Amino acid sequence: MAPEVLPKPQMRGLLAKRLRFHMVTAFVLSLGVAALYKFRVADKRKKAYADFYRNYDAMKDFEEMRKAGIFQSVK
């Protein structure tokens, strides 16, 4: 019986192969996290600001603060 011959290990390009794999993985994961943040946080925040300013009356708030005495220069 002939002894089993082990295959020769690949010695060239190991770092490049690992870097290529990990860079692609990191890029895909970062795109996924950015998309999740946009749809779960940023869009909700943007909608909340739009809803607030849709009905916001700056003059009404100003008059309320003036009547409360917050401003020293406006009587």
From Swiss-Prot:
Gene Ontology biological process terms from the UniProt entry: oxidative phosphorylation
UniProt pathway annotation: Energy metabolism; oxidative phosphorylation
One GO cellular component term noted in the UniProt record for this chain: mitochondrial inner membrane
Organism: Trachypithecus cristatus
Membrane-traversing stretches: 14-54
CDD domains: CcO_VIc (cd22901)
Keywords: Membrane, Mitochondrion, Mitochondrion inner membrane, Transmembrane, Transmembrane helix
Protein name: Cytochrome c oxidase subunit 6C
Role played: Component of the cytochrome c oxidase, the last enzyme in the mitochondrial electron transport chain which drives oxidative phosphorylation. The respiratory chain contains 3 multisubunit complexes succinate dehydrogenase (complex II, CII), ubiquinol-cytochrome c oxidoreductase (cytochrome b-c1 complex, complex III, CIII) and cytochrome c oxidase (complex IV, CIV), that cooperate to transfer electrons derived from NADH and succinate to molecular oxygen, creating an electrochemical gradient over the inner membrane that drives transmembrane transport and the ATP synthase.
Similarity field: Belongs to the cytochrome c oxidase subunit 6c family.
Subunit (UniProt): Component of the cytochrome c oxidase (complex IV, CIV), a multisubunit enzyme composed of 14 subunits. The complex is composed of a catalytic core of 3 subunits MT-CO1, MT-CO2 and MT-CO3, encoded in the mitochondrial DNA, and 11 supernumerary subunits COX4I, COX5A, COX5B, COX6A, COX6B, COX6C, COX7A, COX7B, COX7C, COX8 and NDUFA4, which are encoded in the nuclear genome.
Main location group: mitochondrion
Compartments, record wording: Mitochondrion inner membrane
Residues exposed to the Mitochondrial matrix side: 1-13
PANTHER family given in the database record: CYTOCHROME C OXIDASE SUBUNIT 6C
InterPro entries according to UniProt: Cytochrome_c_oxidase_VIc (IPR051389), Cytochrome_c_oxidase_VIc/VIIs (IPR034884), Cytochrome_c_oxidase_VIc_sf (IPR037169)
The organism's taxonomic lineage, starting at the top: Eukaryota, Metazoa, Chordata, Craniata, Vertebrata
